[in-house]
């Protein structure tokens, strides 16, 4: 089963854009089709973005975070990454390394430029959905 890390932007799109590719990606994890991993740092950044950019109140933010925490394995990475200037991007890489993820799914150009980090592929949502479908098609 694919081990996946979602960047904060994927969660934001999944929760704010119904019927989007991001929601489709998240629903694969909800349905147990992939193993989703996240960290407290990623969830903290998500809460901040939902409050500041989308004016979500604390109750709505907490509901989203609780849902993610039920779907994903929340880890506390024991590694420190300082590869990129944006510290939030480094937190994504730390989570990927600590969880031995197969893929980071993101729309962030700084992460996408890397293409791969420590054995973990870095891809856009559409490519992730294609990879998932292709991987499962070959099992039939």
Where are these regions (language model features)?
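Residues that mark the start of a beta-strand
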Residues: 1-3
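PIN/NYN-family metal-dependent endoribonuclease catalytic core
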Residues: 6, 16, 21-51
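Alpha-helix capping/helix-boundary segments
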Residues: 10-11, 42, 110-111
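Short, hinge-like loop/turn segments at secondary-structure boundaries
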Residues: 53-56, 122-123
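Active-site neighborhoods of divalent-metal-dependent phosphate/nucleic-acid chemistry enzymes
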Residues: 71-104, 109
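Acidic, PIN/NYN-like endoribonuclease modules and their adjacent C-terminal/linker elements
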Residues: 109-140
């Amino acid at each position: 089963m694919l081990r996946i890390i979602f960047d904060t932007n994927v969660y934001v799109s999944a929760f704010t854009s119904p019927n989007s590719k991001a929601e489709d990606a998240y629903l694969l994890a909800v349905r147990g089709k992939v193993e989703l991993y996240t960290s407290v740092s990623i969830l903290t950044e998500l809460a901040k973005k939902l409050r500041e950019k989308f004016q979500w109140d604390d109750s709505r933010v907490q509901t989203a975070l609780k849902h993610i925490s039920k779907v994903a394995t929340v880890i506390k990475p024991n590694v420190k990454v300082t590869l990129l200037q944006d510290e939030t991007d480094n937190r994504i890489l730390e989570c990927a390394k600590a969880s031995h993820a197969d893929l980071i799914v993101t729309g962030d150009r700084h992460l996408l430029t890397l293409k791969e980090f420590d054995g973990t592929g870095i891809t856009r949502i559409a490519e992730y959905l294609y990879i998932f479908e292709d991987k499962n098609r070959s099992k039939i």
